[in-house]
């Protein structure tokens, strides 16, 4: 059993210390999320998305909301889009910084974990200011967010960006100049460009194999085309490259966060003049039309048209996709989720062959997976 973020069971056949075959056993955290999503309203499913990749709940919320909004033909106002990008990049940094810290522990470097976890706690403090919760926030709604960002928080995030950049430099100094750490990663778990594509690997694991594919650049959403950032790639596709790509991605996330705050537009954060979003609470208490609108939206849900859509987002673990099939009304006819962790782990039977048992933690940790999202 490999217990990092959820439970993954590997059945290994060994010849001494060499792995002859590997059979990964998944499903220990299967909860039937897709079927649940077909039996409740679109907005009611948002809290369930928190439990997919629970290390980046806001990323799941927003990806699902974008899929439903694509079905509805809605586009958020500029401030609402910028606010979502801010939440996405904070989530990306939080997920990667924990993955880097835990990976250090996997291969015997305890100190780095403490440094990384301190930065992650700062982001959770921002989550609390923004959403009211530190972990499973359920912040996003179809057509917007539950609340606007406090101005004081934006100033604090800018300070955090400077501090986090220093932590990344310290992390690199501790690990990437450590010969023992480098020897455990370089040349281990090599995935070629061809294999990465054929197995459907996405995210940092794909880019570490030298393929420059990032959905924020390839098919921009939420205004990502308005921000300047680079897509880091590796050369050899080994554990070392997967680690260094995530380090550089965090630097690019800090770069995007600074741009979002510096260019944050004014205006509403939610869709306006639509019956599918909840009105402001103060209007519900004083305006009859708003009260009726809240009642209808809460009891009957968003009235989606018939049709099929697929929306994919560049999440910390890779391409998180939602397929929605609607026959009209407030419930989806079919909900299908593309789990990046499940797709990334599919290569394990082929990848593990020929490696030593001592390489297993290094290889698994380099994938930075979450079983809650893998098993759904």
Predicted segments, located by residue:
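Metal/cofactor-centered catalytic core regions of large enzymes
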Residues: 3-376
């Amino acid at each position: 059993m490999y217990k990092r973020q959820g439970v993954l069971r590997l059945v290994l056949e060994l010849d001494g210390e060499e792995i002859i075959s590997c059979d990964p056993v998944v499903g220990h955290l299967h909860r039937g999320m897709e079927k649940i999503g077909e039996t409740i309203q679109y907005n009611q499913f948002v809290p369930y998305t928190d439990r997919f990749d629970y290390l980046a709940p806001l990323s799941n919320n927003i990806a699902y909301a974008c899929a439903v909004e694509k079905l509805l033909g809605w586009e958020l106002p500029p401030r609402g889009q910028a606010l979502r990008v801010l939440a996405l990049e904070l989530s990306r940094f939080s997920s990667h910084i924990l993955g880097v810290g835990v990976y250090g522990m996997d291969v015997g470097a305890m100190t780095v974990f403490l440094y990384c976890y301190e930065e992650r706690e700062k982001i959770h403090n921002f989550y609390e200011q923004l959403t009211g919760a530190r972990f499973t926030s359920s912040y996003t709604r179809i057509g917007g967010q539950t609340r606007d960002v406090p101005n004081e928080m934006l100033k604090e995030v800018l300070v955090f960006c400077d501090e986090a950049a220093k932590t990344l430099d310290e992390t690199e100094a501790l690990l990437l100049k450590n010969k023992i750490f480098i020897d455990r990663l370089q040349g281990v778990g090599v995935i070629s460009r061809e294999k990465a594509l054929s197995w459907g690997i996405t995210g940092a694991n794909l880019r570490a194999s030298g393929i420059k594919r990032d959905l924020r650049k390839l098919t921009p959403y939420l205004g990502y085309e308005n921000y300047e950032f680079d897509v880091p790639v590796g050369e050899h596709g080994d554990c070392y490259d997967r680690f260094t790509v995530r380090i550089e991605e965090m630097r690019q996330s800090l770069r995007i966060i600074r741009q979002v705050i510096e260019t944050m537009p004014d205006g509403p954060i939610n869709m306006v003049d639509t019956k599918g979003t909840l009105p402001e609470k103060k209007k519900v208490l004083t305006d009859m039309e708003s009260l009726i609108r809240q009642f209808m939206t809460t009891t009957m849900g968003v009235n989606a048209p018939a049709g099929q859509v697929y929306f994919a987002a560049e999440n910390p673990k890779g391409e998180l996709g939602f397929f929605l099939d609607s026959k009209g009304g407030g419930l989806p006819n079919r909900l299908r989720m593309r789990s990046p962790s499940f797709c990334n782990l599919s290569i394990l039977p082929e990848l593990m062959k020929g490696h030593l048992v001592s390489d297993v933690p290094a290889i698994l940790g380099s994938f930075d997976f979450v079983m809650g999202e893998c098993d759904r």
